[in-house]
C-alpha cells in the first residue's frame, strides 16, 4: 500500500486546483505548470542519444546529466546569467593519492550600471561576464530582459524588471520623456512586439505567495450591495420603456378651426 494517496511530485499541481489557487488567472497558472529545462551553462549537452565510439566504431548510448547548481539568495538580487555555485571535491595538493577535500566553484561577479530605455532608469546590478555577453547578443539590456525566459533569467530582480517594462509598454505611459514625445513614440515602437495586455503583465514574475496575496486583496474589495445593482437595473429598464413608447401629442381646441 503506498504511503501517500498521490505521488509527491503531483502535490504542487494538485494544490493549484484547490481553494484560492484555483481562482488565480489562467495565464498565471499555466506559467507555474510549465516545466521548462533551463539552458545548460556549466556543461555541454551531447545533443543526441547515440554516439560512435572512435576506438571500436560501435554506437553507444549517451545521456546528458546536468551538474547540480546551487543558487544562493544573492543570485535573486542580481543577474548571474544562469551561473551559480557548484559543490564538489578536489584532491589535496593536486595529488590523486591524497584525500579529497570539499571545494566550491563560484562565478566571477562584477558590479555594473545598466540603463533601461523603457524605464528610463539606471540600475546598479551584480552581473557575470556571461550576462554581459548575453546583453550584447540581445542588442541591449531591455531586449535581454524581455527576451529571456524565466528559467534562464533565474532572478527575482530580473522578473520584477520585466513586469515593470511590460506594464509601461501596455499602458503607453506618457511619463516617459514627457518633454520629447517623438523619442517616447520611438521607444514604444521599438519594443511593440513584446506588448501584452495589462491584466497579464501585472502577474508576470510574481511568486506563488505574492500571487495569492494579490488575489486575496482583489477578492477582499468591498462588493457592491445587491440592492444597488437591482435599483440600477430597474432605473435602466424604466428609461428604456419610456424611450420606446410613442409620443402622444394632444391637440388644442383651437387647432380644429
UniProtKB/Swiss-Prot annotation:
InterPro entries per record: Ribosomal_bL28, Ribosomal_bL28/bL31-like_sf, Ribosomal_bL28_sf
Q: State the disulfide connectivity.
A: none
Per the record, GO CC terms? cytosol; mitochondrial inner membrane; mitochondrial large ribosomal subunit; mitochondrial ribosome; mitochondrion
Q: Which domain of life is it from?
A: Eukaryota
- Gene3D superfamilies assigned: Ribosomal protein L28/L24
Q: Name one GO biological process term.
A: mitochondrial translation
Q: Which UniProt keywords apply?
A: Mitochondrion, Ribonucleoprotein, Ribosomal protein, Transit peptide
Give the transit peptide, as a residue range: 1-55
Where does the record place it?
Mitochondrion
Tell me the GO molecular function terms. Answer: structural constituent of ribosome
Q: Does the keyword Flavoprotein apply?
A: no
In terms of PANTHER family, this protein maps to: 39S RIBOSOMAL PROTEIN L28, MITOCHONDRIAL, LARGE RIBOSOMAL SUBUNIT PROTEIN BL28M
Q: What does the subunit section of this Swiss-Prot or TrEMBL entry state? A: Component of the mitochondrial ribosome large subunit (39S) which comprises a 16S rRNA and about 50 distinct proteins. Interacts with OXA1L.
Q: Which family does it belong to?
A: Belongs to the bacterial ribosomal protein bL28 family.
Name of the protein in question: Large ribosomal subunit protein bL28m
Q: What is the lineage of its organism?
A: Eukaryota, Metazoa, Chordata, Craniata, Vertebrata
Amino acid at each position: 500500500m503506498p504511503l501517500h494517496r498521490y505521488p509527491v511530485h503531483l502535490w504542487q499541481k494538485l494544490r493549484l486546483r484547490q481553494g484560492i489557487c484555483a481562482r488565480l488567472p489562467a495565464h498565471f497558472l499555466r506559467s507555474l505548470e510549465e516545466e521548462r529545462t533551463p539552458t545548460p551553462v556549466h556543461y555541454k549537452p551531447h545533443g543526441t542519444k547515440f554516439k560512435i565510439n572512435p576506438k571500436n566504431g560501435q554506437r553507444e548510448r549517451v545521456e546528458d546529466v546536468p551538474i547540480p547548481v546551487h543558487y544562493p539568495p544573492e543570485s535573486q538580487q542580481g543577474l548571474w546569467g544562469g551561473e551559480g555555485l557548484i559543490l564538489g571535491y578536489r584532491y589535496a595538493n593536486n595529488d590523486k593519492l591524497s584525500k579529497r577535500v570539499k571545494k566550491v566553484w563560484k562565478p566571477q561577479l562584477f558590479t555594473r550600471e545598466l540603463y533601461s530605455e523603457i524605464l528610463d532608469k539606471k540600475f546598479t546590478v551584480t552581473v557575470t561576464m556571461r550576462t554581459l555577453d548575453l546583453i550584447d547578443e540581445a542588442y541591449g539590456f531591455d531586449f535581454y530582459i524581455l527576451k529571456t525566459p524565466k528559467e534562464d533569467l533565474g532572478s527575482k530582480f530580473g522578473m520584477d524588471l520585466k513586469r515593470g517594462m511590460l506594464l509601461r509598454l501596455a499602458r503607453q505611459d506618457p511619463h516617459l520623456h514627457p518633454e520629447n514625445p517623438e523619442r517616447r513614440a520611438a521607444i514604444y515602437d521599438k519594443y511593440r512586439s513584446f506588448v501584452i495586455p495589462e491584466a497579464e503583465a501585472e502577474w508576470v514574475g510574481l511568486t506563488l505567495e505574492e500571487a495569492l496575496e494579490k488575489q486575496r486583496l482583489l477578492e477582499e474589495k468591498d462588493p457592491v450591495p445587491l440592492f444597488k445593482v437591482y435599483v440600477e437595473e430597474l432605473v435602466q429598464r424604466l428609461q428604456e420603456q419610456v424611450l420606446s413608447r410613442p409620443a402622444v401629442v394632444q391637440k388644442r381646441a383651437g387647432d380644429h378651426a
